């Protein structure tokens, strides 16, 4: 079993589609979840369908660990201060092989690529560009595994 730090790089979005009855530019952001650890990107104010986030998020990851679900879940939203935020769609990225390789080799990486944003698992709502890396922590501890330690 190995424990380490997984870094998720949320780079950009392309062609994001949200229903806005006033036809104003969307303000997209993403809620990111890995095994109960939640992070939120900044709101790309007036970015429209092609936001640039370029943000990195750190998650404590253990492999094989408990539970068999090794997915990063992205919930892409349109911020709306007046009517409440609107759901755009979801992305689910399987990182089981990334973590397994990282435990074997000490580190591993999934280079940035585009992932389809799907509403209700079937309706295409654009894409987000994401890269993921994992670094195994040595010595049985996990120094630096918590975002507030960096």
From Swiss-Prot:
Residue sites binding Ca(2+) 2 per the record: 20, 78, 80, 86
Domain C2: 1-108
Tissues in which the protein is found: Sieve elements of leaves, stems, roots and flowers.
Entry-linked CDD domains: C2_putative_Elicitor-responsive_gene
Cofactor entry: Ca(2+)
Keywords: Calcium, Metal-binding, RNA-binding, Transport
Top-rank taxon, per record: Eukaryota
InterPro entries on file: C2_dom, C2_domain_sf
One GO molecular-function entry: metal ion binding
Function summary: Binds to both sense and antisense RNA. Interacts with mesophyll plasmodesmata to mediate its own cell-to-cell transport and potentiate RNA trafficking.
Protein's name in the database: 16 kDa phloem protein 1
Annotated source species: Cucurbita maxima (Pumpkin)
């Amino acid at each position: 079993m190995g424990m380490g730090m997984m870094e998720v790089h949320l780079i950009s979005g392309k062609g994001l589609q949200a229903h806005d009855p006033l036809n104003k530019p969307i303000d997209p952001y993403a809620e990111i979840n890995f095994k109960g650890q939640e992070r939120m990107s900044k709101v790309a104010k007036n970015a429209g369908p092609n936001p640039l986030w370029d943000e990195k998020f750190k998650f404590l990851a253990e492999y094989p660990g408990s539970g068999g679900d090794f997915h990063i879940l992205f919930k892409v939203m349109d911020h709306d201060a007046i009517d409440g935020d609107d759901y755009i769609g979801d992305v689910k990225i399987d990182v089981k092989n990334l973590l397994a390789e990282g435990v074997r080799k000490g580190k591993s990486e999934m280079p940035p690529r585009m992932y389809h944003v799907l509403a209700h698992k079937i309706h295409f709502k654009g894409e987000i560009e994401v890269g993921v890396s994992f670094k195994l922590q040595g010595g049985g501890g996990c120094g630096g595994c918590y975002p507030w330690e960096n």
